[in-house]
UniProtKB/Swiss-Prot annotation:
Protein name: Troponin T, cardiac muscle
Modified residues (Phosphothreonine): T202, T283
Organism of derivation: Ovis aries
Record region (Disordered): 1-85, 124-208
Changes after translation: Phosphorylation at Thr-202 by PRKCA induces significant reduction in myofilament calcium sensitivity and actomyosin ATPase activity.
Sequence positions bearing N-acetylserine: S2
Amino acid sequence: MSDVEETVDEYEEQEEAAVEEHEESVEEEAGGEARQGGGASAAEDGEEEEGREAEDGPVEESKPQAPGPFMPNLVPPKIPDGERVDFDDIHRKRMEKDLNELQTLIEAHFENRKKEEEELVSLKDRIEKRRAERAEQQRIRTEREKERQARLAEERARREEEESRRKAEDEARKKKALSNMMHFGGYIQKAQAERKSGKRQTEREKKKKILAERRKVLAIDHLNEDQLREKARELWQSIYDLEAEKFDLQEKFKQQKYEINVLRNRVNDNQKVSKTRGKAKVTGRWK
């Protein structure tokens, strides 16, 4: 409901209230006049009857007559003159208001649509930017993977080359030792002399001999910087493996030692129990 309609309704309610108040005031005035007129006529009738009784003497009392029906004087209400309502003007204002509201809704709709389009464009830009960043990251990752594979291939080839060279050196050393043994019999004579003298090698000498056989000649004069770095890495790995093996052997030795102690304690306990049982049987038999 518009403001004009509310004003019209309020005006009509005010008119109805004014009419009702006017009717109530008219009814109250008419009732008061009737009551005053009735009282005056009754007083006059009483005076006339008293005069007649005084003149004529005592007469028989007459019965009182019932009063007639009360008819108040009704006055038609007066409707106050008010402002006339122009319904065309109200309709025009309502149409203008609806038109303004519709125009506001249309403008808000287009503004929201413009904002949504701007957000969509920005979202597309972010998606394209993120896609380009991912493509760049994938390209960098692929290049790094290729470099890593190439580096591994080079290391593998270098390791194979060093292994083949080491094998060739070992073969050459073995051939040289065999040729020396064939040409010189000093080693055989020394072995025969030791066997004849009956000299036996101690554990320390055996250990030294085994270490001398296992120890390889470290030929690093012909290696460049990368090869030296790789050689150091191999030596470090071998030391690491030996330390790990040493640690495992120590732990195994501790476990075996613990198990031996446990078994030894069990054997001692069993021997003590068996001795006490044998003594009890003997004493019981003699009893």
